[in-house]
Amino acid sequence: MRQPPGESDMAVSDALLPSFSTFASGPAGREKTLRPAGAPTNRWREELSHMKRLPPLPGRPYDLAATVATDLESGGAGAACSSNNPALLARRETEEFNDLLDLDFILSNSLTHQESVAATVTTSASASSSSSPASSGPASAPSTCSFSYPIRAGGDPGVAASNTGGGLLYSRESAPPPTAPFNLADINDVSPSGGFVAELLRPELDPVYIPPQQPQPPGGGLMGKFVLKASLTTPGSEYSSPSVISVSKGSPDGSHPVVVAPYSGGPPRMCPKIKQEAVPSCTVSRSLEAHLSAGPQLSNGHRPNTHDFPLGRQLPTRTTPTLSPEELLNSRDCHPGLPLPPGFHPHPGPNYPPFLPDQMQSQVPSLHYQELMPPGSCLPEEPKPKRGRRSWPRKRTATHTCDYAGCGKTYTKSSHLKAHLRTHTGEKPYHCDWDGCGWKFARSDELTRHYRKHTGHRPFQCQKCDRAFSRSDHLALHMKRHF
């Protein structure tokens, strides 16, 4: 009957499990025989092997990958016995912690290829190693997990180029092959390169093409730098390249304002210009610097446009009620740009001093609301009645009355009254001149209607059928049938 495994068997099985570093840091000859030289997978494994191999420090005189590989090759009881060693347990915990790291993500988001940062990290690492005692022993685990790795160029990773400084990526011709120190404390910084996978993902932001940053003015400094990267990029899309936003803080004296400079598709650099927004047409306000300055020039260096007008111009007086400067700025359609401090009066213009006593302010001509509004602004002017034209037809009064006894009809036109009088007198001045017809009529419209009988003209056409009529009242009676 098979017995359950004991503690020694479990320790042996745990020790026999190969680690990730042993696969990545195998013999160079066996990798060359199994994989073709210069393959992308070979380069990726070569980079991982360099990243997994810790540099020997004075307080840590061992190589983690080499030590673990030696212990695994020895195997057997020796490995079981060494599992109880605290130094080996500490090394194994460090190795498992390194296996859990997403190295591609860390390398693609760490600023490790700039000379200034590399020199700073190297100096701090050497200072910390020199300050720690050499007799600390191998059981003390590193606190910052700092290790160095070289980045090799394309081609065979085992063959070093002779003219390009050891075949390193992004290395200058005259510079020796540097090793890029990696520190877990620098993950919050941003770098566009670091690794073969990161090079394939973001080749357009290599640090070689980033110009050196310009020195900041006194009182100002870089507050933040953000790299916005889209996860799904399509060819021809405006989001295919990451955009960098640099924010520079302003100085307390106001000489250097806050700069927010967005970039898209190019290397990040500080932009000396700020986008100027257009002033709205109905904004009667100026900035605080313009009020405190002696001239009418604005704080941004531009002259006010046609909608911004000086307040000290002599204007003709009107009968409209005057408005105070506070009521003018707090009106419904005009919004002030900055709130005025208590006790501060608006700048009257170049013709008057910026601050006047109360006795002198009474002599300044009062400003009217309609005078400040430019033509074509938000508030329309009151409509003025046009001369010579009536806005609505005046109702006519019936002034013409029939003087016949018992009639008493009134008309607005004299011609209508004249036609009516013919009914009383029996006068018919309109005669039909058709051959053989002697009809006479008192009104001209009656003669026109009669003449259509001779000609057959029917100008009133029905819209729902093909019938036509010579009189409009006949068409009205016909339309009642369709309804």
Curated annotation (Swiss-Prot):
Motif position, 9aaTAD: 99-107
Known outcome of mutating E95A: No change in KLF4 polyglutamylation
Ranges of compositional bias, category Pro residues: 338-356
GO MF entry, a single one: sequence-specific DNA binding
Annotated phenotype, changing E381A: Loss of polyglutamylation, reduced cell reprogramming and pluripotency maintenance. Forms heterodimer with KLF5. No change in promoter-binding of target genes. Embryo lethality in mutant homozygous mice
Record's keyword annotation contains Endoplasmic reticulum: no
Physiological role: Transcription factor; can act both as activator and as repressor. Binds the 5'-CACCC-3' core sequence. Binds to the promoter region of its own gene and can activate its own transcription. Regulates the expression of key transcription factors during embryonic development. Plays an important role in maintaining embryonic stem cells, and in preventing their differentiation. Required for establishing the barrier function of the skin and for postnatal maturation and maintenance of the ocular surface.
Name listed for the protein in its UniProt record: Krueppel-like factor 4
